[in-house]
Amino acid sequence: MTDNQSKDAIKLLKKIIKTPSFSKKEENVVKILESWFKENGINYKRHLNNLWAENKYFNKKKPTILLNSHHDTVQPNKSYTIDPFYPIEQDGKIFGLGSNDAGGALVSLLYLFKSIYLSQKMNYNFIIACTAEEEIAGANGIKSILEKLPKIDFAIIGEPTLMKLSIAERGLIVFDAKIKGKPGHAAHENKDNAIEKLPKILNWFNQLKFDRVSKLLGPVKTTVTQINAGFQHNVIPSEVDIVVDVRINELYDINEINDFFVTQCPCQIKARSLNLGPSFISPNHKIIKSANLLGIESYGSPTLSDQALLDFPSVKIGPGNSKRSHSADEYIYVDELLDGIEVYKNLLNKII
């Protein structure tokens, strides 16, 4: 990249940071991205708070690669010591909410797309999609535009991975479980106290082990994350509500895991959604071979992204470090941002 292009990329990231873009409230950052497309002469489409564009010489006879990252953020961590919406550049870092997750990846993919937008001699088409509601796996994010896009053969999802290539990603089921008992006054004996059943059921979840252990993602992980019961000190509640977080490796189908819990769990249990399945791409895929030639490390990701909503092959890669995501005083290194653009280009040059 030229110095001017580097400055432009940094400037765009800072504009994005300055603009609050909480999930479901991304309208203002979308305006910034629309302006960027217009300034660069790129035709785009919009649905809700999602934008996408095709390369200028899109050819339906060619396979298509989707480039995707999100522009929504979580609420700022309460431990911030700086203004989360003021993009300070200091010590080679750009600070601000969404700088790392996933502003850096989004900007890197936009400048990658800009560099190939006018190319006529590519083996693939490219679509760039800047999408909403990733942080909440919302219905009005990438899921809402998939049917509006041409057939996608493969996707690159931009998330902070230190430019390592995530070739597998855990799926997620959140279960709401209910332990039933008999309500009554605390002064009287009660042999059907829902709270007293809790330790045995918690132990069932804690002892749970699934046979298939992934080399990339490890075992299926089951964690009770919330417990709620009672409303008054002298009343024995009729039920205890618990929330269970289940992270699924690529060796299981999400419906298989759901069926197990529904039939085997010692209390009532129901999944909130079965949309966030695990993902995995064949090690023989062209993008994996390209990464190997460049010495890019592959790994399995424990964190969730929009990959879970896709029904075509995908990988996750981007500048930044996922450990900084959702943290106080979030930041990305300037070099990570600019190097990310070049790594994306090198990765695709091997196949396009």
Which residues fall in each region the model found?
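Acidic/histidine-rich catalytic neighborhood of metal-dependent amide-processing enzymes
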Residues: A102-V174, K178
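Active-site metal-coordination/substrate-binding segment of hydrolases
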Residues: K62-I127, V334
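Predominant activation on well-ordered alpha-helical scaffold segments within soluble catalytic domains
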Residues: K14, E34, V107-L110, K114, ...
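Metal-dependent amide/peptide-bond hydrolase catalytic core
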Residues: N4, I167, D176-I352
